[in-house]
Amino acid sequence: MALEDYVAFQKLMGLNVVQVKGTYWCEVRPFFYRPLPMSQVIHQGSTSMPFGAKFCGAQYAVPPEAKANSFLNRLSFENNGDYSLDSLQRNWKRKVRLASKDLIIRPILTASEFKQAAHPAYLSFYERTRYKVRSERRDPAYFANWTDALYRIPNILVLGGFRDRHLGGVSLTFLKDRTLFYATFFCDDDSLKLHLPDLMLHAVRESAAASPDISEVFASMYKGGNGLDAFYVSRGAKIVRQPAHLELNPLAGLIIRNFFPRQYAQLLGQLADVPAPASNAEGPESDPTAPTAPPRPNHSSSSNPNDLDPADLPPRPRL
């Protein structure tokens, strides 16, 4: 996927993206920025940060020899071609086999099919999670326009999980350089109970294992051990650490360090204990570039940690 198409996809998924001197930056929290793609290595002083970063801050990966003050942690599945169902732990293998009895995975090739079949699954996902990003898609007309824009972006694979002819869930993946991004997943309540998240992830990893052009499957940024982290780690994802430089507005830094120490530790990339296996976690729709960052309002009303917005943090302080 070309960089411009990658940026277009991130904008479509709700990110505010700005370009400064040839570098794309995404606003992952109000006035806090990281480059696109997130793993892009930037030499200090080689580019300028967005103007809005002056009010909160920015963070970017740096070369190994540079002086780093933090880490960017991502969850990825190493793709060395040897993945198979038998490589999974017994419980996750059982879930995939159970799901495959009721569900099939196949591409959704046309926008017209997606518009008609995917909207009910999205509405069910929203009612369960209250995930606010691009929640305008609850409106059928908005969802249709969003779908048209999605299908205009080249090289995105849209997979559907079907029960008979009923679409229960959707994933979006794309290949950038040698990384396959498992970018988005949502499903309805019935498909969640039938373990579609496990079957979909298995299908994506199995397909990736057959391609010598894919070195890793990127799942998400590591967010400090929440339910989504547990879902991926328990199924074999590794935490990949990348040295980074963190710059914070002095006042914002003072507030975060003193009133939100846990979030500050996550900003620095300090690893919490590896999350315990989640017995039934959903891989909710998420932007892979939405990692742990300065605190923001919690928009999820669900008490189920498997249904939390993957970027939920305590309320953002008033600056």
PLM regions with names:
Residues 1-80, 162-190, 241-243, 248-250:
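Conserved donor-binding loop and adjoining core beta-sheet/short helix segment
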Residues 2-23, 85-95, 100-191:
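A conserved beta-strand-loop-helix scaffold within acyl/acetyltransferase catalytic domains
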Residues 40-47, 140-145, 199-203:
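Well-ordered, non-membrane alpha-helical segments in soluble/globular domains
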Residues 47-49, 97, 148, 202-209:
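Surface-exposed alpha-helical segments enriched in charged/polar residues
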Residues 54, 101-104, 213:
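Short glycine/proline-enriched coil/turn segments at helix->beta-strand junctions
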Residues 67-135, 258-262, 266-283, 290, ...:
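Acyltransferase donor/substrate-recognition loop-hinge adjacent to the catalytic core
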Residues 152-257:
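Aromatic (often tryptophan-rich) hydrophobic motifs at membrane interfaces
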Residues 224-299, 304-319:
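C-terminal catalytic domain of photolyase/cryptochrome flavoproteins
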